[in-house]
Design a protein with these regions (language model features):
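Acidic phosphotransfer microenvironment of two-component signaling modules
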Residues: 8-11, 59, 92
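Chalcogenol-based redox active-site neighborhoods
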Residues: 33-37, 56, 64-65, 91, ...
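Local sequence-structure signature of Cys/Sec-based thiol-disulfide redox active-site neighborhoods
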Residues: 8-41
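Structural micro-motif
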Residues: 65-74
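Short acidic-hydrophobic, aromatic-tinged amphipathic segments that line or gate anion-handling sites
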Residues: 1-9
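Thiol-based oxidoreductase modules, predominantly thioredoxin-like and allied folds used
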Residues: 4, 23, 39-42, 46-60
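Structural signal for short hydrophobic segments within the conserved structured cores
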Residues: 2, 51, 82-85
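Non-catalytic, surface beta->alpha helical segment in thiol-disulfide oxidoreductase systems
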Residues: 75-103
Length: 103
């Protein structure tokens, strides 16, 4: 999973047809297993790029994208947010979204 280093990099990458971002902090104990589960989950969708953003490193991301808790997983399609899951992540909802995009 590639790590985003700047808000501009995020803006550029979010323009893809579909992309996934996970916002987390370096001290978040919940973020580690959720990130691992997301990576395993996304192995079924290798064509969809996945990125991680550490809020300490990209402060602007938290404010501009209204990230109030971590972990937060956000799906973007051509620069528009289409799904957001925070804290209690519903992987079934994410799978339904990806099935729609696959068809």
């Amino acid at each position: 999973m590639q790590t985003i280093q700047s808000y501009q990099e995020f803006l550029d990458l979010s323009q893809a047809p579909l992309s996934v971002f996970i916002a987390k902090t370096k001290m978040c104990s919940v973020c580690v297993p959720i990130s691992a589960k997301l990576e395993t989950f996304m192995k079924d969708y290798p064509e969809i790029p996945m990125y991680q953003i550490y809020l300490e490193d990209v402060l602007e991301f938290q404010g501009q994208q209204l990230i109030f808790t971590v972990p937060t997983i956000v799906f973007f399609s051509e620069g528009k947010e289409i799904l957001r899951e925070s804290r209690f992540i519903d992987f079934d909802k994410m799978e339904r979204l990806l099935e729609i995009y696959q068809s």
